[in-house]
Amino acid sequence: MSNQTNKAQDNQVEEIVEGELLNENATEATDEASLMDELTQANFRVEELEKALQEAEAKVDAQKDSVIRAAAEVDNIRRRSAMDVEKAHKFALEKFINELLPVLDNMERALQGTDAEAEATKAIYEGVELTAKSFMSTVEKFGLVQVDPQGDTFNPELHQAIGMQPSADFPANTVMMVMQKGYTLNERLLRPAMVMVSQG
């Protein structure tokens, strides 16, 4: 009996050991499957995070581009505004000076129509001449320049031809006579000079 009991006990021990081994193998298999599952989930999460990172980087790049464009636009607006202010300062007097041009023309006509040598009109001539010179020097300080092209080559940007006449004294396309002087304000034409041009 002791042999049988020993065998029975050995069988029981073997069954217990086999059961434990099976349990260990099953646990190891379960642990391995669990680890594989966790690894798969971790890989999936890494892929999700990488995708989210790429999207975030794309958004950052788009924002950087927007910031660069906005900065360039601000610089352009600043430059345009500065140019507009400069032009406004430069040409603010344009309308006012245009109103003064007939006064200058009338003084020129008064000088042309008055005899500078006659005793009766000499004082008037000198007074008008001094007034015209003073007036012209004052407006020149603000950028007004007189265009008096007598003897110059005809320039359609500064002169307006009233007519053409044949002339032996002047080469072709030369201003023979100035009917009315022109004016520029800060290098911008206010009024062209009215001229007679030679045909040659």
UniProtKB/Swiss-Prot annotation:
Gene3D superfamilies in the record: 3.90.20.20, Head domain of nucleotide exchange factor GrpE (2.30.22.10)
InterPro entries: GrpE, GrpE_coiled_coil, GrpE_head
GO MF annotation terms: adenyl-nucleotide exchange factor activity; protein homodimerization activity; protein-folding chaperone binding; unfolded protein binding
Highest taxon above the source species: Bacteria
Localization annotation: Cytoplasm
Keywords: Chaperone, Cytoplasm, Stress response
Protein name: Protein GrpE
The protein's role, per its UniProt record: Participates actively in the response to hyperosmotic and heat shock by preventing the aggregation of stress-denatured proteins, in association with DnaK and GrpE. It is the nucleotide exchange factor for DnaK and may function as a thermosensor. Unfolded proteins bind initially to DnaJ; upon interaction with the DnaJ-bound protein, DnaK hydrolyzes its bound ATP, resulting in the formation of a stable complex. GrpE releases ADP from DnaK; ATP binding to DnaK triggers the release of the substrate protein, thus completing the reaction cycle.
Upper lineage: Bacteria, Pseudomonadati, Pseudomonadota, Gammaproteobacteria, Alteromonadales
UniProt keyword annotation of Cytoplasm present: yes
Species this chain originates from: Shewanella pealeana (strain ATCC 700345 / ANG-SQ1)
HAMAP family (UniProt xref): GrpE
SUPFAM superfamilies referenced in this protein's UniProt entry, alphabetically: Coiled-coil domain of nucleotide exchange factor GrpE, Head domain of nucleotide exchange factor GrpE
Extent of Polar residues compositional bias: 1-11
Keyword Chaperone applies: yes
A GO CC annotation given for this chain: cytosol
Description of how the protein assembles with itself and partners: Homodimer.
GO biological process: protein folding
Pfam families: GrpE
Family: Belongs to the GrpE family.
Region (Disordered): 1-25
